[in-house]
Amino acid sequence: MVGGTVVGDLQVLYQPDRPELGYLPEGPIGCGSGEISWVAIQHGPEQDVGSLNVLDPAAGFNRHVELPGRPGFAFPTDDPDVFLVGVERNVCRVHLGSGECEPVSDEVDGGVENTIINDGVEIDEGLVFGCKDLAFDDFKAGLYFWRAADRRVFQLRDDQLCSNGKVVRRDGTGWWIWDIDSPTKVVVRYRLDPASGTLSDPDTALDLTHLPFFPDGMVEGRTPSTVI
């Protein structure tokens, strides 16, 4: 069933005082302590590096960690000093204190060029994340499941252009995943089996092709039947 859309108001939560941090911000993710993690994908049009950031909105204080590449997402872990970050083509453990960036996955999108990790979402068993074609030209970027227990990466799709927004909900032993490939203007739904690392065929959950703009992100709404 194709849903409808509702328009709401927005307000600025935080404006970085460094222009490089405001060039391509992505996220944010709540850390459970009142803080928010977010990434600056790259620090300018000619840059190929970005940063992990942890914001305390109440204090207006932002911690900043330079990364050796361009990040697509950052999620907190049980260790408050460690975040799981998608950097270029690897899932990495990044330490806030030292800035160490340790790959914990094989490289993704190995069969194609000019793609990087762009967006992800946490599930109990690990991460589901997608990539984007930097030229926004070829539908060649992958969608992946990284399983934390054995650090194994499963390729779920290899035909996306810019994977850019995900919502997940538990369904028995698996997960329903809602995903946007931005240029298609369509939200699709799959069922992920984390034990086998397989994805069902997609069905259309929300058709936005009638709108003049492209969807650039998606998060869970306040009720089970809505997304933002």
State what each model feature region is:
Residues V2-G22, L55-G60, E66, S105, ...:
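A short helix->beta-strand "capping" segment at the edge of beta-propeller domains
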Residues E20-G34, P68-F83, G110-V128, R157-W175, ...:
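Beta-rich, blade/repeat-based domains predominating
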Residues A40-I41, G86-E88, C131-K132, D179-D181:
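Recurrent small/Gly-Pro-centered beta-turn motifs in extracellular repeat architectures
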Residues H43-V49, L134-A141, I180-K185:
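Short, solvent-exposed loop/turn segments at conserved positions within beta-propeller repeat blades
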Residues V49-N53, N90-C92, A141-Y144, V186-V188:
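A short loop-to-beta-strand structural motif that recurs across blades of beta-propeller domains
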Residues R63-L67, E102-V108, F154-D158, T198-D207:
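Beta-propeller fold detector
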Residues L96-G97, Y190-T198:
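Short loop/turn segments immediately following beta-strands, especially the blade-tip
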Residues G99-L156:
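Hydrophobic alpha-helical segments and helix pairs
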